[in-house]
Amino acid sequence: TIPVIYGFGPFCSVALRLKTQFNENSKVLSFCNCLPRIDHDEIMGWEGELADRFTVIFLRNRREDRQMRLRIEATKELIEEAGLRVVELWARGSNRLEKMFSLIYLGDMASIYLALARGIDPYELKSIQAIKLKMAKAGLLEKLSKEISSLKL
């Protein structure tokens, strides 16, 4: 199934990291979003007929505030009632940075294991390299490099 990663607060950036790792390492489509945003629109998509093609991953923190905990539980319940698989990844650590890195590490490893389970080399980046090569041939990289170096930062 296609991973959809949901984070909140500082875990929104972690959700994006996990999405990109599933894309690059596992070579699968993956999506991410943040709570509470998803409860204003995206939650409706789980009522659709394609919903069973996804696995929803919630990034959790044992110290999340009461309101966020209630929101996550309510959202999770609706998604499970729609028949989807839900996974919760719990952060570990004594401070925000440790918790973020614990989830990043777990996501990175999961993306590599998924690639290996699918018989795919997680370090091969054919499509990315092909795009870079086409850009280089078109002179875009050189042009961008010149533009960036001319910026006064």
Regions found by a protein language model. Name each.
Residues 1-153:
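A SIS-like phosphosugar-recognition module
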